[in-house]
Amino acid sequence: LGAGNRGSVYAGYAKKYPDCMKIVGVADKNQFRLKSMAEDHDVPEENRFTDWKEALNKTKFADAVIISLPDNLHYDPCMKALSMGYHILLEKPIAPTEKECTDIRDLAIKKNAIVGVCHVLRYAPYFIALKQIIDSGDIGQLISIQHLEPIQYAHMAHSYVRGNWHNSKETTPIILAKSCHD
């Protein structure tokens, strides 16, 4: 659900590792992104949707759902997909409120479903190297870490001034979008 930047990155894994994963459906309100991803992954017409609700109103047709929608749209599709028996790969943050997060957790437990949260920085070379240094003990016993993630101008202007996160009422505040990284 969602064929934008993140959804395309995760779908790219299916292209690289076709024995591990196959994209069998796509939902995106943007016709260009929908068509592009659907054609790239040979998704049949009956599994192309312009809304996540359309996709989840269809009888279950996959093992898992990737939810890479805007932050404020994580809860409802996640709860619906879990109730249908899907496993979930969920873009961070899980949801905007603590209650929504615990609802997702509780339903996943009830349905014995996996909800994997995409903490993408965990796999960035910088953080891998930092963890190796800490784990090696070369710098002694760690007492505290203070980390600043500078947001480059182009990313800030694109995402937080003009882009998807320009208005906290429409998505989530920048502190939630950025501070939920691992």
Segment roles from a protein language model:
Residues 1-42:
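N-terminal Rossmann-like dinucleotide-binding module
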Residues 20-22, 42-44, 61, 138-141:
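Short loop/turn motifs at secondary-structure junctions
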Residues 25, 64, 144:
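Short, Asp-centered acidic motifs that coordinate Mg2+ and/or phosphate
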Residues 28-30, 52, 69, 146-149:
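Residues that line or immediately flank small-molecule/substrate-binding pockets and catalytic motifs
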Residues 43-107:
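Beta-loop-alpha module in the N-terminal Rossmann-like domain of NAD(P)-dependent dehydrogenases
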Residues 121-182:
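Predominantly a Rossmann-like dinucleotide-binding segment in NAD(P)-dependent oxidoreductases
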